[in-house]
Regions:
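Noncatalytic, beta-rich nucleic-acid-contacting surfaces in large DNA/RNA-processing enzymes
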Residues: 1-338
Length: 338
């Protein structure tokens, strides 16, 4: 994803600043998105951002209200651990027992905190290793922690943890997410084009091309089904959410166009997100590639030419025709003499 964004924008991701106030706003609200839709229903700006776009992590963002890069690193630790967040850090933070900065998020937090409290380095390391592997604490370790004024809530939190993420991994993940968020804020069309390219299998062009009302209606239809929604619909919903956000920012989809669209990738074209041929219902990956490759060798002259050289079957041909891809092409090369 990041390489495609670099190719489309010309912006080197390694030059993207870690600290950008506008980018940070999408992790605690929607201000940085410049939403144009007055009836916009979402309260998060992190849809489509790796690590931060899922419903689970969006709830974390609500509970923690991150304000800085370091907060995002902690959230990454919470989300990748087992029994680190649910029934543990979440309850401590929401109840006010601990702040996000105090709660345990990555394995390094434990050793650093215990050393700060005065626990000997070797013991702090041993405790960290036991906790991160889900082995809890011995009575002796608990007593040592109490002797150094480690609060009871911290000791109990350690005993609940089954697995912990290393801080270095969390930092690497968040750096990537932060860079992608930068493109989302400052290069929105390119961001959405790259996102939908990755999710094309779950993209329904018959809904998205109709615009924001149709997208919202389809989202609500799937949500109403609840647990009765199919796996395909569950996979479709996050893609619809990102499409809804995109349209709410004032951007549009453009139907696939012969001679301009790519076979597989969504493109930025005239300020819109241009669909690839593979996004058309009934057009598979192989057909889309062959269709585009044959056109690049020699432009199609007729619909019959598309069928023969492009190896496009009748179903795909009908969908292309309905989509407008074949507009301007005569059906055959035969000419009437009378």
């Amino acid at each position: 994803m990041i390489r495609q964004l670099q190719d489309m924008t010309g912006v080197d991701p390694t030059k993207v600043p870690i600290k950008d106030d506008k980018v940070m706003t999408i992790f605690n609200g929607i201000e940085g998105l410049d939403i144009k839709n007055p009836d916009y229903k979402f309260t998060h700006g992190s849809y489509g951002i790796p690590e931060f776009g899922t419903k689970f992590v969006r709830q974390m963002l609500d509970d923690t209200k991150p304000e800085a890069f370091a907060d995002l690193v902690r959230i990454s630790g919470f989300s990748h651990g087992t029994d680190v967040w649910l029934g543990n850090a979440q309850e401590l933070i929401v109840s006010g027992t601990a702040t996000m900065k105090d709660a345990i998020s990555t394995r390094d937090d434990i050793m650093n905190y215990l050393r700060l409290k005065g626990v000997p380095n070797k013991d702090a390391f041993t405790i960290m290793e036991k906790v991160r592997k889900g082995k809890g604490l011995t009575e002796e370790q608990e007593e040592l922690m109490r002797e150094n004024d480690v609060p009871e809530w911290y000791i109990e939190s350690c005993k609940k943890i089954k697995y912990m993420f290393p801080r270095a991994h969390a930092v690497a993940y968040v750096m990537m997410s932060n860079r992608i968020a930068y493109y989302k804020v400052y290069y929105p069309v390119e961001f959405y084009a790259v996102y939908f390219t990755a999710k094309v299998a779950y993209f329904d062009e018959k809904v998205t091309l109709k615009g924001i009302d149709a997208i919202e209606a389809r989202m609500e239809e799937i949500i109403r089904k609840g647990k009765d929604a199919s796996k395909k619909e569950e996979d479709e919903l996050p893609v619809l959410e990102v499409a809804y956000e995109m349209c709410s920012r004032g951007y549009e989809f453009a139907p696939a166009r012969l001679g301009i669209s790519d076979s597989m990738r969504f493109l930025s074209y005239e300020g819109k997100v241009l669909l690839p041929f593979v996004a058309i219902s009934g057009v598979g990956e192989g057909a889309a590639r062959t269709f585009a490759e044959e056109y690049s060798r020699r432009p199609y002259e007729t619909v019959e030419d598309v069928s023969e050289r492009g190896k496009v079957n009748k179903t795909a041909l009908d969908e292309m025709r309905a989509h407008g891809v074949l507009d301007g092409l005569p059906e055959t090369a035969q000419m009437s003499l009378f």
